[in-house]
């Protein structure tokens, strides 16, 4: 959200969510330019991966399908992924979804997984018995078991696509 409002920090209450949606809508498509700038800023240090949560998870998917030069992308509960099913990624992608996430219906997630399996085998997706935001311990939806498993899968994925991750 920094493109719209520098240094913004939002809570997970109704006001924070409402403000976050407004900021996302103000920035939306232009956010990929910020991702591109961030990638360029660190590219000389070695292979670059992007990891995003919620809208950031959608941006990670956009980066994987729109940009070249990434070693990999990880999306945690990216709400846009089902509507972008069938796109081909330019790098390996790991996607995490919560089965109880009311904002990302399972029929869309399952359609995304099937479309990607048919079109793009570089995409690996996992569904957890959890809600949206299951990885964030500051939220009521935090699910330690799902978060731990998703994080272990993320670290293994990062090692696979980048080499040793520390």
Each model region followed by its residue ranges:
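N-terminal cap/leader regions of alpha/beta-hydrolase-fold enzymes
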Residues: 1-166
């Amino acid at each position: 959200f920094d493109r719209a409002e520098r240094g913004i920090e939002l809570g997970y209450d109704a006001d924070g969510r409402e403000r976050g949606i407004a900021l996302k809508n103000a920035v939306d498509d232009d956010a990929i330019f910020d991702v591109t700038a961030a990638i360029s800023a660190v590219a000389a240090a070695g292979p670059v991966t992007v990891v995003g949560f919620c809208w950031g998870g959608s941006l990670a998917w956009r980066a994987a399908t729109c940009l070249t030069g990434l070693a990999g992308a990880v999306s945690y509960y990216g709400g846009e992924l089902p509507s972008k099913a069938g796109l081909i990624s330019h790098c390996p992608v790991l996607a995490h979804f919560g089965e109880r996430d009311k904002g990302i219906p399972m029929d869309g997630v399952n359609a995304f997984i099937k479309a990607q399996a048919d079109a793009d085998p570089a995409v690996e997706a996992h569904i957890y018995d959890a809600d949206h935001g299951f990885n964030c311990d500051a939220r009521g939806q935090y699910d330690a078991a799902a978060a731990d498993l998703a994080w272990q899968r993320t670290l293994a994925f990062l090692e696979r696509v980048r080499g040793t991750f520390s």
